[in-house]
């Protein structure tokens, strides 16, 4: 993942919060139980938290309210600008992405919501290998994202979106890199993590991986 999605992020920045509130019918199911998904990620995190894809700051705010020390990473200038307006004065968001970032301190938990699918499976593998080097034993990765049980589940979801006339959603599912649970499980395990997957809506699962 380089900067190829930054234009999309900048365009989406000013309408993102309306998306997560379910105002776009095509993405209503993707963002179903959005607040509960964020809370679940917060509850599974601890200590110093590195957040990738801060976006407009929704998860960041909940992490801060829960007493976490948060280091935010966000590639989009527009997203960073909106997030800074919503977050406490003085909170710093650093430009970067899942693979290119600076770590200012010891990290206990790495979190992200609705973003890891911007990486190819090969890039996901490289990222998790990198995080494995950052985390001590007991450290965690907690990612919430659209992921599929298997190829059949993915194919059925794309077909259903097309049948419902949700062509933007179908195109999104076919353009980005939404992976399968067995692939992610293999990536986590080979990099020294024990991982569990919890489904929170039709699309989104929370991946909780603990460094062994």
From Swiss-Prot:
Residue sites binding S-adenosyl-L-methionine per the record: 53, 74, 97
Lineage: Bacteria, Bacillati, Bacillota, Bacilli, Bacillales
Taxonomic source organism: Bacillus cytotoxicus (strain DSM 22905 / CIP 110041 / 391-98 / NVH 391-98)
InterPro entries: Methyltransf_25 (IPR041698), SAM-dependent_MTases_sf (IPR029063), Uncharacterised_MeTfrase_YrrT (IPR023553)
Function: Could be a S-adenosyl-L-methionine-dependent methyltransferase.
PANTHER family tied to this protein: TRANS-ACONITATE 2-METHYLTRANSFERASE, TRANS-ACONITATE 2-METHYLTRANSFERASE-RELATED
Protein name from the UniProt record: Uncharacterized methyltransferase Bcer98_3087
SUPFAM superfamilies xref list: S-adenosyl-L-methionine-dependent methyltransferases
Family membership: Belongs to the methyltransferase superfamily. YrrT family.
């Amino acid at each position: 993942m380089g900067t190829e999605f930054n234009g999309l992020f900048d365009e989406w920045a000013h309408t993102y919060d309306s998306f997560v509130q379910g105002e776009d019918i095509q993405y209503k199911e993707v963002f179903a139980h959005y607040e509960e998904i964020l809370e679940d990620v917060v509850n599974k995190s601890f200590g110093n938290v590195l957040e990738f894809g801060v976006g407009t700051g929704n998860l960041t705010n909940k992490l801060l309210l829960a007493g976490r020390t948060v280091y935010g990473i966000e590639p989009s200038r527009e997203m960073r600008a909106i997030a800074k307006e919503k977050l406490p004065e003085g909170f710093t968001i650093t430009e970067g992405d899942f693979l290119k970032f600076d770590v200012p301190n010891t990290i206990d938990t790495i979190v992200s919501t609705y973003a890891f699918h911007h990486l190819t499976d090969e890039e996901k593998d490289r990222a998790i290998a990198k995080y494995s080097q950052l985390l001590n034993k007991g450290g965690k990765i907690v990612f919430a994202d659209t992921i599929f049980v298997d190829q059949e589940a993915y194919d059925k979801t794309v077909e259903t979106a097309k049948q419902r006339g949700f062509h933007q959603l179908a195109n999104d599912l076919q353009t980005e890199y939404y992976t399968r649970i067995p692939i992610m499980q293999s990536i986590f395990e080979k990099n020294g993590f024990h991982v569990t997957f919890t489904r929170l809506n039709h699309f989104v699962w929370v991946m909780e991986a603990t460094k062994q």
